[in-house]
Amino acid sequence: MKFVDLLLLVLSTFFLGTNFVAVKIGVEQFPPLFMMAMRFTLVAVLLIPFVKAPRDRMFQVFLISVSMGTAHFGLFFIGISGVDAAITAIIFQLGVPFSIIFAWLFLHETFGRRRAFGILIAFVGVIFIAGTPGSQSSHLHMFIVLASVFAWGIAAVQIKRLRDVDAITLTAWMALFSAPQLYLISAITESGQIT
């Protein structure tokens, strides 16, 4: 592996790790769904002017906005409001096993005994670490984070089927579709958006 590739890998891991801390700080200032809606609004405003609309794929992008934008990120922001950032990061590691299982169920991809054993170890490991006594995390919020990872696994399969839409275009239009969904749910279920 080239040094530049290694550096990019370390930087992406660093930014992913700091994301959990940044979100934790954010949900202490704003209601979780409202904060996520604002985040998607900013993403849409910044990206939409620079990408074309995937016209023949709009319905698929909308479905991804429901599973990834609203379900995954919405549940993630609600969950992390009652869970330690470190525990959230550990639970998030189940995203890969969930994706493998959903790819097997919906895309008919196969995996062998070693991968099945790895999936089992991942689930047992997360249960063991996340359930460690002394954590200040709410079990309900842990379950909500787990549900967000489940939604991410479903979205990963949907995205894999959408090969002809690039990542930036998908992100822009998913944000545009997700923001109103989250504003609406926030208006119904949350309070204190503007204080």
Predicted ranges, named:
Residues 1-34, 134-161, 180-184:
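Glycine-/small-residue-enriched transmembrane alpha-helix faces in small-molecule transporters
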Residues 14-15, 19-20, 48-92, 100, ...:
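Specific transmembrane alpha-helical segments of multi-pass solute transporters/efflux pumps
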Residues 21-29, 80-81, 85, 127-140, ...:
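Membrane-interface helix termini and inter-helical loops of multi-pass transporters
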Residues 29, 55, 82, 108-110, ...:
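Helix-loop interface residues and adjacent transmembrane-helix termini in multi-pass membrane transporters
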Residues 34-44, 77-110, 148:
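Specific alpha-helical transmembrane segments that line the substrate/conduction pathway
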Residues 41, 47, 64, 101-106, ...:
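Hydrophobic transmembrane alpha-helices of multi-pass small-molecule transport proteins
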Residues 43-47, 99-100, 105, 137-194:
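Transmembrane alpha-helical segments that form core, pore/gating elements
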Residues 57-67, 111-123, 141-142, 165-176:
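Cytoplasmic-side transmembrane-helix entry/capping segments in multi-pass membrane proteins
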